[in-house]
Amino acid sequence: MKTKYFIPIIFLLLFTRCSTNSDTDLKNFPEGYTPEEVGTRISKRFISGKHMLHKKNGKDGIHYAEVCTWYGALKYAVAADDTALIKQLQNKFDPLFTTEADYQPRMIHVDLNMFGCLPLEFYQITKDKRYYDMGIPYADTQWQVPDTATTEEKDWARKGFSWQTRLWIDDMFMITIIQSQAYKATGKREYIDRAAREMVMYLDELQHPNGLFYHAPDVPYYWGRGNGWMAAGMTELLRYLPKDNQDRPRILEGYRLMMKNLKDYQLPDGMWSQLVDDPSCWAETSGTAMFTYAMITGVKQGWLDKKEYSPVARKAWMALIPYINEEGDVTEVCIGTNKKNDKQYYYDRRRIVGDYHGQAPILWCCFALIE
């Protein structure tokens, strides 16, 4: 009598085990969902695309969202060992030394200075000093106070922070990405140490007990992509911040608090909302992809418990891919959004297709998955 139950029980146990492994698996994905397929599609789409400029006349040069996408494609190409793709990305960049030199952003604003992360990444790959010479001034001038600085900007500098400090949450990606790259390119601790100190100040000033961040201190809404910049910024900083940095424990604490609460705010289908804590708001792709990148990296780096967070990251990745259309464009991307103390404003933001704000973090997920 016992024998007839034995085989079904074995199959049940095996099925349960396979299902559990599948839920936590960040290596094996079905066809169409692999990071190699997705990364190649979106990278090729980027190579064929036009520049996104800060102003219509190009006065302030390449837009930070394009830089983020370029950086993501380059990191993906390196992780995938795709030398042909690296060369294509380099060929797209090199006119910035010559015919497109006017597109190099001025070193006057946090959103512009982050451009330097891209030539510094090329420098680390090629060892061509042209890229170093282009990139490193963007890191240096973030702490070199210009004569035109306002009183508030000078006050930040006197406290040891960047004169470009605004206490806007997206700053914590823009500052950390360029300072981290400068540290990697030079080996000089001052770059990443000062970025870490800045991050701690932002965490102390802006993070709420639920781990999230208002779009701005006077705008009490947890906007998805705004929080995504913070999640990605902490992730990027922790990737390279030396273990003996005195601020690392505080940053890791803030990161884990955010990830813990994001796990609870994830929608049943795996996405996150345009307003993170409002499940009735529409699912937005750029913020979701940034959160996914932060969690994938946290699991793989050992900052997060694998059993607890791998299913969250995998579910999010699987939910994101259907939002990529046949052309390789990410859909349901919130348009660029300035702060406004009006909840309906965030509900009504236009949703766009193929914007670099959405393309970039998908590529970050791709390289994080295959590194």
Describe every region a protein language model picked out:
Residues F46, K50, A73, A77-A80, ...:
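Sec/Tat-exported extracytoplasmic proteins
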Residues P105, H109-D171:
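Extracytoplasmic mature domains of secreted/periplasmic and thylakoid-lumen proteins
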Residues M1-D25:
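Bacterial Sec-dependent N-terminal signal peptides
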Residues D25-V67, A79-I86, P95, Q104-G116, ...:
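CBM-like carbohydrate-recognition segments
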Residues D60-A73, I108-Y123, L167-M172, T176-Q179, ...:
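Aromatic-lined, polymer-binding surfaces characteristic
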Residues P35-H54, A84-P105, D133-K154, R189-L212, ...:
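Long, well-ordered core segments of solenoidal/helical folds
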Residues R158-S162, A216, K343:
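Short acidic (Asp/Glu) patches
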